[in-house]
From Swiss-Prot:
The gene is matK. The lineage of its organism: Eukaryota, Viridiplantae, Streptophyta, Embryophyta, Tracheophyta. GO terms for biological process: mRNA processing; RNA splicing; tRNA processing. This is Maturase K. The keyword Chloroplast applies. It is found in: Plastid, Chloroplast.
Length: 470
């Protein structure tokens, strides 16, 4: 900070400068000038643009554009004398170097710019367009000056400014950032970080994607391969289930998307759980429609707009960012179909007994029904409307009661009166009592009027109970 103050004081321009450190949680855009890293990989002469040659706002724009391009994997520099920096399938080195970069190096970008630049851009951009800048970077108007600019971070005619080591390091930083940004398994988090700028936790900067959706459509016209990425941004939701001793990730997507999830899942598992996982043990298979029907949890997703308030520069700026939150609906028809196939109810949802379980003890019967109900409840607790969840609980509860009554050759009503509230306790468990994967809560910033996140638990459904005992 002392260097920053000295740098601003020595600046030959007496006009006011603006510094906008844009904070996420573990990522930060901050300042830098021509020093460090063998000559600052982010430096380029900007005299041709008409302002301070130490400022590099255009380079900032190129950097951000580059971050959202298609190439998410680390690649090596075109140097035959150098070994590959990180191989495509070498997950160990990918994990090691990405963590080293994120922990040791900070992505530093110099973003001071002059008032005359701001005023000139304000004349170019109409007020109506300013209102539509929903990107996380909308506080930088110059980032929207050329929406169709799809060039690399450094043009070919200036690539010689960087040494080979710096080019390799820069690509390292860029790919590490993109990999962490796009493929963190946020659906495992109990609570999203406050500075993710998304209430659903699907992406760190999902508002940027939706704010730029028209821009992506323009790219689709010129480059057909971008269509899949555009669809991927619109439907990024992933499902997790444990099925017959295996962990299954379910998503609608292309084979390339599944390979990216596989790559990051290996790194995520090894880093957070300190457990070595062999990539070849993760298989990519296509589930048939009947498999989805049997699992019975292919949920519907609504995207509702909401406002997130960002706190920046120690209360100096309060910015309301429009984001789109997931609101999941319980697929009650699919669940009833699965329960009917497993002989817990009729196709119309009327509870029936489970004759095959009548040979078990009362405790085992109640435990099996209760375990199924609790696991389904944990999965469906992410929905804001729980009427369908209560219906599923009703079916399982009365199916359990009918099974016990059939075992004891008694009427269901009489059996429920004799059992009392003990049966109810097995089917209603508070969410706080569920053992789930909990990440540390971010406490650096807080949002005005923030509420508890609706979450998806790691232990979602044990469909084994619907299979092995049917």
């Amino acid at each position: 900070m002392e260097e920053l103050q000295g740098y601003l004081e020595r600046d030959r321009f007496r006009k006011q400068h603006f510094l906008y450190p844009l904070l996420f949680k573990e990522y930060i855009y901050t300042f830098a000038h021509d020093r460090g890293l063998n000559g600052s990989i982010f430096y380029e002469s900007a005299e041709i643009f008409g302002y301070d040659n130490k400022s590099s706002s255009v380079l900032v724009k190129r950097l951000i554009i580059r971050m959202y391009q298609q190439n998410y994997l680390i690649y090596s520099v075109n140097d035959s004398n150098q070994n590959r920096f990180v191989g495509h399938n070498n997950y160990l080195y990918f994990h090691f170097y990405s963590q080293m970069i994120l922990e040791v190096f900070t992505v530093i970008v110099e973003i001071p710019f002059l008032l005359r630049l701001v005023s000139s851009l304000e004349r170019k951009i109409p007020k109506s367009q300013n209102l539509n800048l929903r990107s996380i970077h909308s506080i930088f108007p110059f980032l929207h000056e050329y929406p169709n600019w799809n060039s690399l971070i450094t043009p070919n005619n200036s690539i010689f400014l960087f040494s080979k080591e710096n080019k390799r390091l820069f690509r390292f930083l860029h790919n590490s950032y993109v990999s962490e940004c796009e493929f963190v398994l946020v659906f495992l988090r109990k609570q999203s970080s406050y500075l993710r700028l998304t209430s659903s936790g699907a992406f760190l900067e999902r508002t940027h994607f939706y704010g730029k959706i028209e821009h992506l459509h323009l790219i689709v016209v010129r480059r057909n391969y971008f269509q899949k990425t555009l669809w991927f941004f619109k439907d990024p939701f992933m499902h997790y289930v444990r099925y017959q001793g295996k962990a299954i990730l379910v998503s609608k997507g292309t084979h390339l998307l599944m390979k990216k999830w596989k790559c990051h899942l290996v790194n995520f598992w090894q880093y957070y759980f300190h457990f070595w996982s062999q990539p070849y043990r993760i298989h990519i298979n296509q589930l048939s429609n009947c498999s989805f029907y049997f699992l019975g949890y292919l949920s519907s997703v609504l995207i509702n707009p909401s406002v997130v308030r960002n706190q920046m520069l120690e209360n100096s700026y309060l910015i309301d960012t429009v984001t789109k939150x997931f609101d999941t609906r319980v697929p009650v028809i699919s669940f009833i179909g699965s329960l009917a196939k497993a002989k817990f109810c009729t196709v119309s949802g009327h509870p029936i007994s489970k004759p095959i379980w009548t040979d078990l003890s009362d405790c085992d019967i109640i435990d099996r029904f209760g375990r199924i109900c609790r696991n389904l409840s944990n999965y469906l607790s992410g929905s804001s409307k729980k009427q369908s969840l209560y219906r599923i609980k009703y079916i399982l509860r009365f199916s359990c009661a009918r099974t016990l009554a059939r075992k004891h050759k008694s009427m269901v009503r009489a059996f429920l009166q004799r059992l009392g509230s003990g049966l109810l306790e097995e089917f209603f468990t508070e969410e706080e009592q569920v053992v789930s994967l909990i990440f540390p809560k971010a406490n650096s910033f807080s949002l005005h009027g923030s509420h508890r996140e609706r979450i998806w638990y790691l232990d979602i459904t044990c469909i084994n109970d619907l299979v092995n005992y049917s």
